[in-house]
Amino acid sequence: MKIDFASSRQSTLGVEWELALVNAQTGELASVANEVLRGVSANHPELNEDDEHPHIKQELLLNTVELVTGICETVAQAKADLSSSLAAVREVTDPMGVEVFCAGSHPFSPPQLQPVTDKARYAKLIDRTQWWGRQMVIYGVHVHVGLDSRDKVLPVLDGLVNYFPHFQALSASSPFWGGEDTGYASQRALMFQQLPTAGLPFQFSTWAEYESYVQDMFTTGVIDTISEIRWDIRPVPNLGTIEMRICDGLATLEEVGAIAALTQCLVDEFSTILDNGGTIPTMPPWHVQENKWRAARYGLEAIIILDAEGNEQLVTDHLLETLNRLEPVAAKLGCSDELADVEKIISRGAGYQRQRRVAAEHGGDLRAVVLDLVKQMRNGPTA
């Protein structure tokens, strides 16, 4: 089958931020997304009663809303867009006694008790995936970056795969699951890959190979739409973007901006390499798979595999080298401040580390963890 790749301006940006709705007193998940979305629409008279807000969306579970930016030129613009949408949500949730937070998972609310949004595609997903599908009490951040040529898509995807453990380690924020410490930095990473077509992307040498794969998925009934290919990094042909979906949910707008800047800078760097006739190295899939597991297990303490030769380095050391290398790219894109915020995540600890600290300070009380995440979203990162 032929798959067109939409025209897109190079290195433009879009961000999706999935937020959990919780009871402000107990910290338990609150399945009130429908009420929140109705309230948001009511506060915007330009929308009809049944119209969906263009930047505030439904998700799989009724305890979730998703903030979606428009097409942005800079990370600062994307952050401002998300901030405006978050304020619109708060106009509705504050009087309801509902708070919002973001992490890779909820620390203690039972996954099996969370109602699913009443839509045919969600019902089909749960019917097919059963127990695993009902466990998807997970939240993430997705970053789209525009590509100006279809020929760049697969090499850029391969380039981002090389940085999979960096994104996973920085964002890891799901150490707890159903009230238990899993021992992992990111439970979400290993949970989400249980769904059909989720997980690491395949490697393709040509766009025709990718088209053939998609055709096979349609022919065998694996997917009904191309969006059901839920890889951790994927092309989005109708938008003309590459979408980085690796990250656990991020607690603050500052952290979302940092991850968006790192994504935008890497994609722009890869694009420039290709424009200049260069190539982007790839790693064997067994190294890629191992890197995903190491980052999910150990987070910022992971020793990662750097290349096909099997050279290894502490992920934070390689991140700092990468940030230095990307400084000129960030200056060109206008995201130097946001890229510098990546180093702040390293210095104060990723979400999984901060959650464990709060739990330890409160005798293992995971309600305190949720309330701290709520506070971070309102006030910014805690030291």
Curated annotation (Swiss-Prot):
This is Putative glutamate--cysteine ligase 2-1. ATP-dependent carboxylate-amine ligase which exhibits weak glutamate--cysteine ligase activity. Pfam families: GCS2. It catalyses: L-cysteine + L-glutamate + ATP = gamma-L-glutamyl-L-cysteine + ADP + phosphate + H(+). GO terms for biological process: modified amino acid biosynthetic process. HAMAP family: Glu_cys_ligase_2. It comes from Arthrobacter sp. (strain FB24). Disulfide bonds: none annotated. One of its GO terms (molecular function) is glutamate-cysteine ligase activity. Keywords: ATP-binding, Ligase, Nucleotide-binding. Its EC number is 6.3.2.2. It comes from the Bacteria. Belongs to the glutamate--cysteine ligase type 2 family. YbdK subfamily.
